[in-house]
Curated annotation (Swiss-Prot):
Enzyme nomenclature, EC number: 3.6.4.-
Gene field: rapA
GO molecular function: ATP binding; DNA binding; helicase activity; hydrolase activity, acting on acid anhydrides
Protein name listed in UniProt: RNA polymerase-associated protein RapA
UniProt short sequence motif DEAH box, positions renumbered to this chain: 280-283
InterPro entries for the chain: Helicase_ATP-bd, Helicase_C-like, Helicase_RapA, P-loop_NTPase, RapA_C, SNF2-like_sf, SNF2/RAD54-like_C, SNF2_N
Role according to the record: Transcription regulator that activates transcription by stimulating RNA polymerase (RNAP) recycling in case of stress conditions such as supercoiled DNA or high salt concentrations. Probably acts by releasing the RNAP, when it is trapped or immobilized on tightly supercoiled DNA. Does not activate transcription on linear DNA. Probably not involved in DNA repair.
Family statement: Belongs to the SNF2/RAD54 helicase family. RapA subfamily.
Residue positions binding ATP: 177-184
Domain Helicase ATP-binding: 164-334
Alphabetical list of HAMAP family matching this protein: Helicase_RapA
Disulfide linkage: none
Length: 969
């Protein structure tokens, strides 16, 4: 291949990029700029997947300025073409057009050229291509796009929040659901929608160090989003590729600590030009008016430079209104600038909440409530609605009038658009916790080793001593060596063996603080009783943990017991189990809540049993009593636990380190009192209005119904299997709704998108995918389907075919020509064009006279009457009627224009309807709710203008065609 600057080439693999221009070359590579889609590509010079663009005499070509030229002569000079000819619009002759000025939007790879050249595809490939176009079109138009393909149960409040926020331009919100309600999943769904719609291409997730793997796994397992963890080591490696290591990946995950410690890395992250920033555990960002913490400043710096920001926090505002304000200030500093003004404004929402409560109850509205509503909304808006509510209209009309009032009030509610918070109290469907505390005698061996350790302990801080005393088995091993079998005499192990045997039919999750303890417990279960158990700890790779989790999840032949270490269990959920054993206790209430949260989550079908075996007169006994009597943390979620712990931690550490429990009762009593006070403050301050808004009510149910109606789509299964067949993947039925798909030697391409080298087990069933983490959940949004469709399109599979129609009612040799056109607007993905004008297939069925029969001849039914022909015979048939085909394509091209106009018109209508409604709503709200940002309104106005241009320029192209010949035998 010889390249020269200014030459025009087209990509073989990505024909939708438009026409490319050579803009740079060196000895090994060539760079092409595709102006139509605002993309650049760098290829290896010797095997670049591109084709040189040359036109011949008689062709009509478009210039960038919008006029067309009919070519009469072509000259080549130093590798560049110049075209001479007549302008189509002014009829001027001897016009010169150099190839550098050719329109960027020109397309190639005509299916008719393939047909004439005898490159005839199989009939079933033509069918697959048409179905791919059809399905892709429907998926892009679906308002639920981005929500159907995730591996998660359909939980109304999560879907509502994700749907509400995911569609916004550059969303800036605070997700503050209580523990166990699935904030990570909500954030993942929002990210997924933003990625699919093209609104977010570069994403940075900042989390505490211990949660990095959890996020990595959740994003990959649930949403097929592959993030890269960045730490110092990774940045040094990446430096070889780019000056700023953050530029080497689109999806980056790093810890807050990493950015805090290194100013250099923080500054590089600031220059990363992110579209979306996600910060987990945002309640750890300390802020006060005089002195914000370094962590807070790091996040503030990133939030100022990033359009979209999601903050996740589990702490309710009543425990720290100031810190709550600080979080909102990160999202919108112009709006939340003064803490005192914020407090005052918050207090004005009480009447809104009262008004909404009376609307929700469905009772007659008292005058007081009416006056409050009229004050908040303008009179002309509410009067007609009041009339409907009080008239004898049918219940449905009343309900919808009520809902409209509620929606309007919600919109005007101060933080309704910025803050979402669901509480367990407001969401039903949580299991009951049955707590079993079991004090046990301490073995003599432990008493001795702990006494000796105390005597020779040397200088240790009280905190280190307190932690050490919690794990007597480790102290024993310090004296007796790592291999000492403490599990032969530990009374907790004896109890555990009996419990597991007693619960033969139940899955048991055991959590211990240390990985070494977990490994030795597995050995004890195996060697002493032959019980099938598997281990899960931080020393294992993600793949090994997946395998362990899958082994535990298996109904038949799986492990009965899974033993986790503290860190190993983070972020994993085992809702299918309901027996939890805490072999020891963690040091703080947050970790305790996390442990219970492995089973006690939304989606848990049964009540859970929490077993806490502990050794009498040890540190564990102190903690067990404090957690149970001081916080009631085993039986209920404990949002207040951290605040109580912070106050009494010094006293607790002192007791755990010294073993002196003389004032334990007093600490427990005071803790219980403080806990009760904080909880009642929480209950009184519950923002009912916010809860009503956050759980989405009716709307949330409708979203669930829409998505569940697409689950189990047989159309998807049929399509996926044909797709895998065509591309050449091996498929083995595994039973239980599962298939194993592996690459084969005769594949169309060296590697299949989204499929690991060793293959994958897939399922189309959501419930199976939820209980088996080792399976891929296949939906229309999965990379294996999306990538497969892109592959079909780019490889030109099924663009031309020939079929026979056995029908004695028609004369032998009658021909029909099936034409499939695609209307496509070339525009950057982030413009949001696919919502209104995705690639749209238009099918036409031309008879020999040039009439379109497609309205009478439905695709699937007609296709069943056809039979395939081999390539040799097909080629002969094409040659014999080539002239007719040519004139039928011309007739089709003329007829399709009108249909394209209809498609454009519909796209305009959809776009205007959707965006104008949103624009009017925001403009009306801006007058009463300062939470509407100017950028949001400007962005929609800009989007309407941009999209109008793109839709007007949408082009139609013949995508594929099939010649059909009538035969009688």
């Amino acid at each position: 291949m010889t390249f020269a600057l200014g030459q025009r080439w087209i990509s073989d693999t990505e024909s939708d990029l438009g026409l490319g221009t050579v803009v740079a070359m060196d000895a090994r590579t060539v760079t092409l700029m595709f102006a139509a889609s605002e993309e650049n590509r760098v290829y290896a010079r010797n095997d670049a997947p591109v084709t040189r663009v040359t036109f011949n005499v008689g062709d009509v070509i478009d210039c960038q300025e919008g006029w067309s030229l009919k070519v009469e002569e072509v000259l080549e000079d130093e590798g560049l073409y110049t075209y001479f000819g007549t302008r189509e619009d002014t009829q001027e002759t001897a016009i010169v057009l150099r190839e550098i000025f050719l329109s960027n939007h020109i397309r190639f790879n005509k299916p008719q050229d393939k047909l004439y050249a005898g490159q005839i595809d199989r009939m079933d490939n033509f069918v697959l291509r048409y179905r791919a176009l059809q399905n892709q079109f429907e998926q892009h138009k679906s308002p639920m796009r981005g929500l159907c393909g995730m591996r998660a149960g359909l939980i109304p409040h999560q879907l509502y929040i994700a749907h509400e926020v995911g569609r916004r331009h550059a969303p800036r919100v605070l997700l503050a659901d209580e523990v166990g309600l699935g904030k990570t999943i909500e954030a993942g769904m929002i990210i997924h929608q933003q990625v699919l719609s093209g609104r977010a291409e570069r994403i940075l997730i900042v989390v505490p160090e211990t949660l990095q793997h959890q996020w990595l796994v959740e994003m990959m397992r649930r949403f097929n989003l592959h993030f890269s963890i960045f730490d110092e080591e990774r940045c040094i490696e990446a430096f070889a590729e780019a000056e700023n290591p953050f530029d080497t990946q689109q999806y980056v995950l790093c810890s807050l600590d990493f950015l805090r410690k290194s100013r250099k890395r923080f500054e590089q992250a600031l220059e990363g030009e992110w579209d979306l920033l996600v910060v987990d555990e945002a309640h750890h960002l300390e802020w006060s008016q005089d002195k914000p913490s370094r962590e807070y400043q790091v996040v503030e710096g990133l939030a100022e430079r990033t359009a979209g920001v999601l903050l996740l926090t589990a702490t309710p505002e009543q425990l720290g209104r100031e810190s709550h304000f600080a979080r909102l200030r990160l999202l919108d500093p112009d709006r939340f600038y003064d803490y005192d003004a914020f407090v005052e404004e918050e207090e004005q929402y009480a009447p809104v909440a009262d008004a909404i409560t009376s609307l929700f109850s469905g009772e007659k509205l008292p005058d007081e409530a009416k006056n409050q509503i009229t004050e908040l909304l303008s009179e002309q808006d509410v009067e007609p609605l009041f009339r409907i509510i009080e008239s004898d209209s049918d219940e449905e009309a009343k309900a919808s009038a009520r809902q409209e009032l509620i929606d309007n009030l919600m919109d005007r509610h101060g933080t309704g658009r910025v803050l979402f918070r669901n509480t367990r109290a407001a969401i039903k469907g949580f299991p009951k916790r049955n707590v079993h505390l079991m004090p046990m005698d301490i073995p003599q061996q432990y008493t001795t080793s702990m006494r000796v350790s105390g005597m020779i302990g040397g200088k240790m801080t009280p905190e280190a001593r307190a932690v050490k005393n919690l794990y007597p088995e480790e102290i024993f091993q310090e004296f007796e060596g790592e291999d000492s079998s403490w599990w032969q005499f530990d009374s907790r192990v004896n109890w555990l063996l009996e419990k597991v045997k007693e619960k033969r039919s139940d899955k048991v999750l055991v959590i211990a603080s240390r990985a070494s303890t977990a490994l030795q417990l597995e050995q004890a279960l195996r060697e002493r009783e032959g019980i099938r158990a598997t281990v899960f700890h931080e020393g294992m790779s993600i793949l090994e943990r997946d395998k362990a989790a899958a082994y535990f999840a298996q109904e038949e032949g799986g492990a009965q017991v899974l033993i986790c270490s503290e860190i190993g269990s983070e972020g994993r959920n085992f809702q299918f189990a309901n027996q939890l054993v805490m072999f020891d206790l963690p040091f703080n209430p947050d970790l305790l809540e996390q442990r219970i949260g492995r089973l006690d989550r939304i989606g848990q079908k049964r009540d859970i049993d929490i077993h806490v075996p502990y050794l009498k007169d040890t540190s564990q006994a102190i903690l067990a009593r404090w957690f149970d009597e001081g916080l009631n943390a085993f039986a209920e979620t404990c949002p207040t636990g951290r605040a109580v712990y912070d106050k009494y931690s010094d006293a607790l550490i002192e007791m755990l380190a010294s073993g002196d429990v003389s004032n334990l009762d007093e600490v427990i009593e005071e803790s219980a009192k403080m806990n009760k006070e904080l909880k009642s403050q929480l209950e009184q301050g519950r923002d009912r209005l916010l809860e009503m808004h956050s759980n989405g009510g009716e709307k949330a149910q409708q979203i669930v119904e829409k998505i569940s109606s697409t689950d189990g789509d047989t159309n998807l299964v049929t399509f996926a299997l044909s797709l895998f067949d065509t591309i050449g993947l091996n498929q083995d039925d595994k039973g239980e709704n599962a298939l194993v798909v592996t690459p084969s030697e005769h594949m169309m391409v060296p590697s299949y998108p989204g499929l690991p080298y060793e293959g994958a087990t897939i399922t189309f069933d959501r419930d199976t995918a939820l209980s088996r983490e080792d399976m891929h959940f296949i939906s229309w949004e999965h990379p294996m389907i999306q990538g497969g469709i892109d592959l079909l399109m780019s490889e030109g599979v099924g663009t031309s075919a020939v079929s026979l129609l056995k029908n004695k009612a028609l004369p032998v040799g009658t021909i029909l020509l099936e034409l499939v056109y695609a209307v496509d607007a070339q525009a950057p993905k982030r413009s949001g064009i696919t919502r209104f004008l995705p690639k749209t297939p238009i099918r036409m069925m031309m008879d020999a006279r040039g009439n379109d029969l497609s309205p009478q001849v439905e695709f699937e039914g007609f296709n069943r009457q056809l039979s395939p022909v081999n390539r040799h015979l097909g080629s002969k048939l094409v040659t014999s009627v080539q002239k007719d085909i040519h004139s039928l394509i011309e007739a089709g091209d003329a007829l399709v224009e009108q249909k394209v106009e209809e498609v454009r018109k519909q796209a305009h209508q959809d776009m205007q309807q959707s965006l104008n409604a949103e624009l009017e709503r925001l403009q009306a709200l801006k007058a009463v709710n300062p939470n509407i940002r100017d950028e949001e309104i400007e962005s929609i106005e800009e989007q309407i203008k941009e999209l109008t241009g793109y839709i007007n320029q949408a082009q139609v192209q013949l995508d594929s065609l099939r010649l059909i010949v009538v035969s009688h035998n």
